[in-house]
């Protein structure tokens, strides 16, 4: 039966605060019409959205709700017994508003918008089944699974392998019997955690300029140290002798960068933040993009254009020593699974790929699972058309509760969920604060985007933002050769930041202060996770294993995820990785 606590909890689930007198009224109505609190609140939400523009309940509109809806059901009860022969309830926990008449009990249809319990009609000619799906959101229309995803034939296929052959032979084995005492922490930032209640975008121009200037100075000093350059001059200094200048790459127009539009902005200390056009005709090889900090050698005979001879951009530090902390060192082999959203196909909200991933985790029991958003993509058609009958946040909480149940089937698996600015229920800012949920699960930990994890001495960098694609759309490259994807990933390591592009892509809202405090990469990680729309890959770049698992779904079909096996040896570490189709 309904109680004040249950009714209050159900309203809070939808983010609604209700006065005590309304709570008492709801409890009495539940008792009068013999309905539980959850069903009552769901029916109220449907009625409110369709007739009251989503208004919160009060005594007056509750009376209207009862008069219009429950009186209909009371009038139909006299015919219920004769019409229910041969019908059995499905017991589905999924609420579907406006379900087809063929799967509804004739005597219980309140209206197309009312919450009803679908029935399975037993007839000889036609049999309609209604499968339950605890990962599907409440909706005003039934959600049908993707035919393309359901009929795929390459489930579990390994499409790419990398690393030590001996480890690859064991990478697919379950790890439930191999219990590791892992110590996992987030590598801290100087400014602490990102707060959800921060004033995002509140930027003073002089503070923003000072922050960028400080970043240019620091990165350019690292480049000088690595390249053996001793002294810098102003970007506007007139000289016929070869000099070195430092600054940030910019474009002279609001357009894509090209070799004739490159501008170099110097530091305040050396150049009073002045800019100078750059002539790259004499440079044999370079790879540049807006926001990149570089050091150039060349001449500037008139002070109006810097004729570059050589470009230096590598500020990457040394790879982190995996045994730097002897009290926190990996013992044995660690299994890791990495997956990136979206977690449902673009034509439905059934989250079948996520359920298959959960099944894989339950079977193989990896030590660590890293999942990057989005979980509820703001670009999904079902999100845009407003057919969900529950809040985005409440549905996300339901997804997390389902993941929390993995503690029963895979008790030693630790799940780290990295936020995404593309989630409909979260803040649209980068760097992105960590998620939060209504319930605490001991096996689930929320991380911001980006973040750096220390897993028993193994450093893992993670971001959910497609920085590889963003840089690719703005980069100009001459004479570099080699692999483009490795070069793009190398920019992140060499610039010591998860997002070196500035101005950012139009689809991304970047807070400059948060970027300076929380998007820096102070060390070269052993593993760097960079989900991207580019084809999946695993490559070693500057001593770091870069993993692009791609996405768990691709349109209406299935995608891929990555699995890794890391072993710590006396003198070195070994990493093996595979890309697997879901």
Predicted region positions:
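Extended recognition/assembly regions associated with phosphoester-bond processing machinery
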Residues: 1-582
């Amino acid at each position: 039966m309904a109680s004040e606590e249950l009714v209050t909890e159900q309203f809070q689930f939808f983010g609604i605060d209700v006065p005590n007198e309304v709570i008492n009224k709801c409890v009495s109505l539940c008792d009068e019409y013999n309905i539980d609190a959850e069903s009552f609140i769901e029916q109220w939400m449907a009625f409110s959205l369709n007739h009251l523009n989503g208004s919160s309940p009060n005594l007056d509109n509750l009376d209207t709700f009862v008069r219009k809806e429950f009186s209909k059901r009371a009038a139909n009860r006299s015919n219920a017994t004769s019409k229910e022969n041969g019908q059995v309830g499905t017991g589905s926990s999924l609420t579907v508003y406006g379900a087809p008449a063929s799967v509804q009990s004739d005597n219980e249809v309140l209206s197309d918008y009312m919450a009803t319990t679908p029935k399975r009609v037993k007839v000889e000619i036609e049999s309609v089944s209604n499968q339950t799906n605890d990962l599907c959101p409440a909706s005003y229309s039934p959600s049908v699974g993707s035919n393309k995803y359901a009929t795929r034939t390459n489930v579990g296929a390994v499409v790419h392998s990398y690393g030590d052959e001996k480890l690859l032979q064991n990478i697919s084995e379950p790890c439930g019997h191999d219990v590791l005492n892992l110590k996992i922490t987030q590598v801290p930032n100087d400014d602490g955690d990102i707060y959800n209640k921060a004033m995002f975008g509140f930027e003073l121009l002089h503070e923003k300029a000072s922050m960028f200037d400080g970043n240019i100075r620091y990165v350019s000093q690292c480049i000088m140290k690595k390249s053996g350059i001793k002294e810098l001059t102003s970007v506007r200094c007139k000289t016929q002798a070869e000099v070195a200048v430092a600054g940030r790459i910019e474009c002279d127009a609001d357009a894509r960068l090209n070799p004739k539009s490159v501008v170099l902005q110097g530091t305040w200390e050396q150049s009073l933040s002045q800019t100078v056009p750059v002539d790259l005709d004499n440079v044999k090889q370079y790879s540049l993009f807006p926001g990149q900090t570089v050091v150039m050698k060349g001449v500037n005979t008139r002070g109006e254009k810097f004729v570059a001879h050589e470009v230096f951009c590598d500020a990457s530090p040394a790879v982190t020593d995996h045994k730097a902390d002897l009290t926190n060192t990996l013992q044995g082999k660690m299994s890791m699974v990495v997956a990136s959203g979206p977690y449902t196909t673009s034509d439905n909200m059934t989250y079948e790929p996520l359920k298959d991933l959960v099944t894989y985790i339950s079977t193989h029991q990896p030590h660590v699972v890293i999942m990057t958003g989005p979980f509820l993509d703001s670009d999904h058609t079902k999100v845009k058309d407003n057919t969900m009958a529950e809040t985005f946040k409440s549905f996300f909480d339901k997804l997390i509760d389902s993941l929390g149940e993995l503690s029963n089937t895979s008790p030693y698996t630790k799940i780290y969920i990295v936020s995404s600015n593309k989630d409909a229920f979260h803040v649209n800012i980068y760097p992105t604060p960590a998620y939060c949920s209504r319930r605490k699960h001991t096996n689930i930990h929320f991380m911001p985007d980006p973040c750096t994890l220390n897993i028993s001495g193994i450093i893992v960098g993670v971001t959910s933002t497609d920085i590889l694609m963003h840089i690719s759309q703005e980069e100009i490259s001459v004479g570099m050769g080699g692999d483009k994807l490795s070069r793009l990933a190398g920019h992140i390591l060499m610039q010591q930041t998860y997002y070196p592009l500035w101005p950012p892509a139009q689809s991304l809202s970047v807070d400059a202060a948060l970027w300076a405090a929380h998007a820096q990469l102070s060390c070269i990680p052993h593993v760097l996770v960079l989900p991207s729309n580019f084809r999946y890959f695993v490559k070693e770049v500057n001593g770091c294993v870069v993993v692009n698992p791609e996405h768990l779904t691709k349109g209406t079909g299935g995608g891929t995820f990555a699995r890794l096996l890391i072993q710590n040896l006396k003198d070195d570490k070994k990493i093996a990785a595979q890309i697997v189709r879901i």
